[in-house]
């Protein structure tokens, strides 16, 4: 049996550097680069590890606000995320704050799979995959990405008008029988 670690980064909200940008000389114990440094140091002790982005990365910092206002592209943010070598990610509710075209462009640029099994556009999931399997030695790890179905309660309707949000719980129940057949370890 392999020694496996799961590292989850969540709610980064575009804070790449260890600062909240309120002053020039401020250092905070936060940010994607600092989290990645800690993860990379720790993961050496495991046979296998997974680095996961749990969503809410696309909106929330002055950096993200600058990108949408001045370039209309998330490319600089995506460049950082791609260099972090995530194994997979999922969507948070704030990924929808700048509209669906901006989100889709971001998803196309990411170099890791973004899993979301319960948000649909027309008849297929918004992301390429909802469930993915990874082989780790003699074990199979099954991963399902789920996002809150309550996004329509607080997101601007024009940002999500072509999407259908299914219950995360019901979606998990639907996928679990198959995942249990194929996976030794299930990650939600």
Q: For the regions a protein language model found, what residue spans apply to each?
A:
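Acidic, metal/ion-coordinating pockets
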Residues: 1-188
């Amino acid at each position: 049996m392999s020694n496996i670690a799961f590292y989850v980064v969540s709610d980064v909200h575009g804070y790449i550097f260890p600062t909240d940008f309120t002053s020039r000389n401020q250092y905070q114990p936060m940010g994607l680069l600092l989290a990645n440094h800690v993860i990379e140091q720790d993961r050496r002790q495991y046979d296998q590890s997974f680095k996961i982005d749990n969503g809410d990365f696309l909106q929330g910092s002055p950096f993200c606000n600058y990108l949408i206002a001045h370039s209309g592209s998330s490319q600089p943010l995506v460049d950082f995320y791609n260099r972090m070598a995530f194994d997979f990610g999922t969507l948070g509710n704030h990924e929808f704050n700048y509209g669906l075209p901006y989100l889709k462009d971001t998803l196309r640029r990411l170099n890791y799979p973004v899993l979301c099994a319960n948000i649909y556009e027309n008849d297929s999931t918004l992301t390429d995959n909802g469930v993915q399997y990874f082989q780790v030695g003699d074990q199979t790890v099954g991963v399902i990405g789920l996002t809150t179905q309550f996004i329509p309660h607080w997101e601007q309707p024009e940002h999500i008008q072509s999407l259908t949000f299914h219950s995360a719980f019901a979606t998990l129940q639907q996928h679990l029988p198959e995942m249990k057949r194929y996976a030794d370890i299930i990650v939600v």
